[in-house]
């Protein structure tokens, strides 16, 4: 399924924050990306409705398998590009 780059950015951010913090809530995404609470709330609703994330009763975000696959692919690509452009020489 084709998704927009903004959705990919949100999924990658959730993955990175999960690795760093363990638990992730929408406010963590707001703080990380600098977007408004309203924008992040709308995006999380769309990601949830499309089966990319789950939100528990405490507001914790969890990547579901389709979301995790996309996030890991994007994260891997960004790490590879960063490594390529940061190499000395």
Where does each model-flagged region fall?
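Basic amphipathic alpha-helical segments that dock to polyanions
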Residues: 10, 29, 40-50
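Solvent-exposed alpha-helical segments within well-ordered globular domains of core cellular machineries
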Residues: 12, 42-45, 72, 83
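Residues at alpha-helix termini
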Residues: 33, 50, 88-89
């Amino acid at each position: 399924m084709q998704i927009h780059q903004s959705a990919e950015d949100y999924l990658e951010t959730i993955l990175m924050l999960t690795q760093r913090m363990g638990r992730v809530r929408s406010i963590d995404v707001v703080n990380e990306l600098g977007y408004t609470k309203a924008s992040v709330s709308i995006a999380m609703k769309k990601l949830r409705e499309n089966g990319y994330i789950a939100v528990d009763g405490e507001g914790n975000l969890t990547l579901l398998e389709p979301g995790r696959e996309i996030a890991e692919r994007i994260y891997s690509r960004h790490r590879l590009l960063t490594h390529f452009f940061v190499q000395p020489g």
